[in-house]
């Protein structure tokens, strides 16, 4: 069971999709095919040279 969280570009809702069951990525609320992976809220620190 591989579950991933995506954000719909059209309606803005967060959607949990089980990738082991389906390969069709669509928003179940509005039917949009454009989904984004949300970025983590933790800021990254990059060491400057």
Swiss-Prot record:
Cofactor, free-text remark: Binds 1 zinc ion.
Key word Transferase present: yes
Entry cofactors: Zn(2+)
Keywords assigned: Cytoplasm, DNA-directed RNA polymerase, Metal-binding, Nucleotidyltransferase, Transcription, Transferase, Zinc
Binding site for Zn(2+): 11, 27, 30
Keyword Transcription: yes
Any one annotated GO CC term: cytoplasm
Record field: catalytic activity: RNA(n) + a ribonucleoside 5'-triphosphate = RNA(n+1) + diphosphate
InterPro entries, per database record: RNAP_P/RPABC4, RPABC4/Spt4, Rpo12
One example GO MF annotation: zinc ion binding
Protein name: DNA-directed RNA polymerase subunit Rpo12
One GO BP: DNA-templated transcription
Function in brief: DNA-dependent RNA polymerase (RNAP) catalyzes the transcription of DNA into RNA using the four ribonucleoside triphosphates as substrates.
Primary location class: cytoplasm
Protein location: Cytoplasm
Family stated for the protein in its record: Belongs to the archaeal Rpo12/eukaryotic RPC10 RNA polymerase subunit family.
EC number: 2.7.7.6
Subunit structure, interactors included: Part of the RNA polymerase complex.
Organism expressing this protein natively: Pyrococcus abyssi (strain GE5 / Orsay)
